[in-house]
Amino acid sequence: MNAVVLFSVLFALACGQVSSFCIPTEYMMYVDRRECAYCLTINTTICAGYCMTRDINGKLFLPKYALSQDVCTYRDFTYRTVEIPGCPHHVAPYFSYPVALSCKCGKCNTDYSDCTHEAVKTNYCTKPQTFYLGGFSG
């Protein structure tokens, strides 16, 4: 009995190390433009989760590309565009944002991802909120 339990625990740990848990995850973002009367609340999906990484000893002898670690990033995504209500006529009221369709563990691509550890902006509204209910897409 003990051998079966031990084997099960070891097997579960091995599977957990091999598989990554990098998946599209629901995320709520707030779009707040200084010139517009309202803050827009958008429900979208982002890539979030765990990717297996290893810290390599002997970093001095390795090329720089071998030192970067995998992050949970977009495999496939699309952009959606919404209109922020209450903007004056001289202000472009449109805001585009990515929607994760599928994710992967890989190198962070700064062309379409924020590769910083923590976001610089805070995610909250300073004005009355309105919710995006769909309809306009780019």
Curated annotation (Swiss-Prot):
<dbReference type="InterPro" id="IPR006208">
    <property type="entry name" value="Glyco_hormone_CN"/>
</dbReference>
<keyword id="KW-0732">Signal</keyword>
<feature type="glycosylation site" description="N-linked (GlcNAc...) asparagine">
    <location>
        <position position="43"/>
    </location>
</feature>
<feature type="propeptide">
    <location>
        <begin position="133"/>
        <end position="138"/>
    </location>
</feature>
<dbReference type="GO" id="GO:0005179">
    <property type="term" value="F:hormone activity"/>
</dbReference>
<dbReference type="GO" id="GO:0051592">
    <property type="term" value="P:response to calcium ion"/>
</dbReference>
<feature type="disulfide bond">
    <location>
        <begin position="39"/>
        <end position="125"/>
    </location>
</feature>
<comment type="similarity">
    <text>Belongs to the glycoprotein hormones subunit beta family.</text>
</comment>
<feature type="disulfide bond">
    <location>
        <begin position="47"/>
        <end position="103"/>
    </location>
</feature>
<dbReference type="GO" id="GO:0005737">
    <property type="term" value="C:cytoplasm"/>
</dbReference>
<keyword id="KW-0964">Secreted</keyword>
<dbReference type="GO" id="GO:0005615">
    <property type="term" value="C:extracellular space"/>
</dbReference>
<feature type="disulfide bond">
    <location>
        <begin position="51"/>
        <end position="105"/>
    </location>
</feature>
<comment type="function">
    <text>Indispensable for the control of thyroid structure and metabolism.</text>
</comment>
<dbReference type="GO" id="GO:0043627">
    <property type="term" value="P:response to estrogen"/>
</dbReference>
<dbReference type="Pfam" id="PF00007">
    <property type="entry name" value="Cys_knot"/>
</dbReference>
<comment type="subunit">
    <text>Heterodimer of a common alpha chain and a unique beta chain which confers biological specificity to thyrotropin, lutropin, follitropin and gonadotropin.</text>
</comment>
<dbReference type="GO" id="GO:0033189">
    <property type="term" value="P:response to vitamin A"/>
</dbReference>
<dbReference type="GO" id="GO:0007186">
    <property type="term" value="P:G protein-coupled receptor signaling pathway"/>
</dbReference>
<keyword id="KW-1015">Disulfide bond</keyword>
<feature type="disulfide bond">
    <location>
        <begin position="108"/>
        <end position="115"/>
    </location>
</feature>
<protein>
    <recommendedName>
        <fullName>Thyrotropin subunit beta</fullName>
    </recommendedName>
</protein>
<feature type="signal peptide">
    <location>
        <begin position="1"/>
        <end position="20"/>
    </location>
</feature>
<feature type="disulfide bond">
    <location>
        <begin position="22"/>
        <end position="72"/>
    </location>
</feature>
<dbReference type="InterPro" id="IPR029034">
    <property type="entry name" value="Cystine-knot_cytokine"/>
</dbReference>
<dbReference type="InterPro" id="IPR018245">
    <property type="entry name" value="Gonadotropin_bsu_CS"/>
</dbReference>
<keyword id="KW-0372">Hormone</keyword>
<feature type="disulfide bond">
    <location>
        <begin position="36"/>
        <end position="87"/>
    </location>
</feature>
<keyword id="KW-0325">Glycoprotein</keyword>
<dbReference type="InterPro" id="IPR001545">
    <property type="entry name" value="Gonadotropin_bsu"/>
</dbReference>
